[in-house]
Amino acid sequence: MKILVMNGPNINFLGIREKGIYGEQNYEALVSMIQKKAEELGADVEVFQSNHEGAIIDKIQEAYYNDVDGIVINPGAFTHYSYAVRDALASVAAIPKIEVHISNVHTREEFRHTSVTVPVCNGQVVGLGLKGYLYAMEAVVDLAMKK
């Protein structure tokens, strides 16, 4: 079982930016949590982060060629406007995908209430902090096993 966990813009600044929203833990702590969860699930995991839209699209396309079984993605701000990321996710329709957000985007600024990417994902986890990634990983493994 291969899982790709993808993070978009500014996720690498966890523990630095807006601690009241995103918490005190840094990006390395998140990666460590993800790796531990993958071990528990018996899965191989690749964790990827980029502040660049094209790099995220390239990684989604690579997932197809690398026989990735499931994708967990936090597109960051690309969630709200990147039809290019949305189309890349749609192009790998056979791969289960869960969108995750650390904060509850539905209770924040109005522009955050819309996700152009979630309609091409199997589900969404929001507002559960960094643990949301772990729940998303469980869900994507479950979906992949049902394929």
UniProtKB/Swiss-Prot annotation:
One Pfam family linked to the record: DHquinase_II
Disulphide connectivity of cysteines: none
Top-level taxon: Bacteria
Catalytic activity from the UniProt record: 3-dehydroquinate = 3-dehydroshikimate + H2O
InterPro entries per UniProt: DHquinase_II, DHquinase_II_CS, DHquinase_II_sf
Associated pathway: Metabolic intermediate biosynthesis; chorismate biosynthesis; chorismate from D-erythrose 4-phosphate and phosphoenolpyruvate: step 3/7
GO molecular function: 3-dehydroquinate dehydratase activity
Enzyme class, first EC level, given as a word: lyase
Annotated site residues (Transition state stabilizer) in this chain: R17
Positions with a binding annotation for substrate: N74, H80, D87, I102, S103, R112
Cross-referenced Gene3D superfamilies: Dehydroquinase, class II
Active site residues according to the UniProt entry: Y22 (proton acceptor), H101 (proton donor)
Family: Belongs to the type-II 3-dehydroquinase family.
Subunit structure: Homododecamer.
Summary of the function given for this chain in its UniProt record: Catalyzes a trans-dehydration via an enolate intermediate.
This protein's name: 3-dehydroquinate dehydratase
Organism: Lachnospira eligens (strain ATCC 27750 / DSM 3376 / VPI C15-48 / C15-B4)
Gene: aroQ
